[in-house]
Amino acid sequence: MNQILNAQRLIQLSQFHPKLKNIWYLVAAATFSVCNEPQEIPKLYHYAMLLSNDNAHMYRFTLASQTIDLLRSELPMRKTLINENYQQPTFFQKQLTAKFREVILKTGPLAGLPRAINGLTMLKETTPDILVPHLDPIDPWEAAMGNSSPLSETSMRRKHDKTIQERDHTIQNGLRHWNSIYNKVSTRVVNNLNSSYPDLWYYTLVHVYGPLFAFDEILSAQETSLVIIASLVPQDVNPQLRGHLKGALNIGCDKETVEAVRGLAILISQWCGVSWKSGVVKL
């Protein structure tokens, strides 16, 4: 499998722009996932985990090299080393792990479920065992007969809507999030989707914006907005990217941060061999 990130590039990403100090790794993870380079995600994850330690900024190059060496080791030894490094993960490291998962999940409807599956699988294989949820196996055959649950509800971060009222609440959250992003053009964009195919708007609202994009218990609304921009940059979809660049401003991101996210996603896309038909739209 092609290897794109080395120690020097990890440092380059981490120092790309001061405004991205606490989100560069999430922006990068989304971009690599969309570019179908999931093998790079563990490097971002472990480098960000190591940088969270006290005084880590003083040893950026050493930690970047350690990250590359760790993930280059053979699988049994690699897993042992990972578990030894994180016997007592900090609150921030637990939070960081959850954010990486959430970022990749949110790329699913933007770039395709298969790529999100590949990214989350690669992340799981290099996550310390202590930070991997311990779940009872799901039996889809029994669940299809109504004899067991098809969901690990106690471990899910999202609440499973069991009543009409709960479903309506999720949809309303999705609409509020949508209106915050699209603002003055919200009505026009909704009716453009609806007139293209009513089921397109239904899917967008009920299955994407409601339960996924509006969910802010792991990523903030601003973080989600920036991750969406990073996910759109490699795909040569300027109409959608233009809307989300403006939407990020509407939802509270400052212009310099939005432009930095766009720039970082372009750099990573170029590393991945992406080309664009007519350039990448900007604010």
UniProtKB/Swiss-Prot annotation:
One cellular component (GO) term of this entry: cytosol
Any one GO molecular-function label of the UniProt entry: peroxiredoxin activity
Compartments, record wording: Peroxisome matrix; Cytoplasm, Cytosol
Motif (Peroxisomal target signal 1 (PTS1)): 281-283
Keyword Glycosyltransferase among UniProt keywords: no
Signal peptide from the UniProt entry: none
Phenotype when the gene is knocked out: Impairs growth on oleate as well as on the non-fermentable carbon sources ethanol and acetate. Leads to increased level in threonine, serine, valine, isoleucine and histidine; as well as a reduction in citrulline, tyrosine and phenylalanine.
KW Cytoplasm (keyword) present: yes
Keywords: Cytoplasm, Peroxisome
InterPro entries: AhpD-like, CMD-like, PTS1_Protein
Family under the similarity heading: Belongs to the PXP2 family.
Chain's role: Probably involved in peroxisome formation or maintenance as well as in amino acid metabolism.
Misc. comment: Present with 1890 molecules/cell in log phase SD medium.
Domain characteristics, as noted in the entry: Peroxisomal targeting signal 1 (PTS1) is a tripeptide located at the C-terminus of more than 95% of all peroxisomal matrix proteins. The prototypical PTS1 is the terminal tripeptide SKL (serine-lysine-leucine) but the consensus of PTS1 is defined as [S/A/H/C/E/P/Q/V] [K/R/H/Q] [L/F]. However, this description of the PTS1 consensus must probably be expanded beyond the terminal tripeptide.
Name recorded for this polypeptide: Peroxisomal protein 2
Encoding gene (name): PXP2
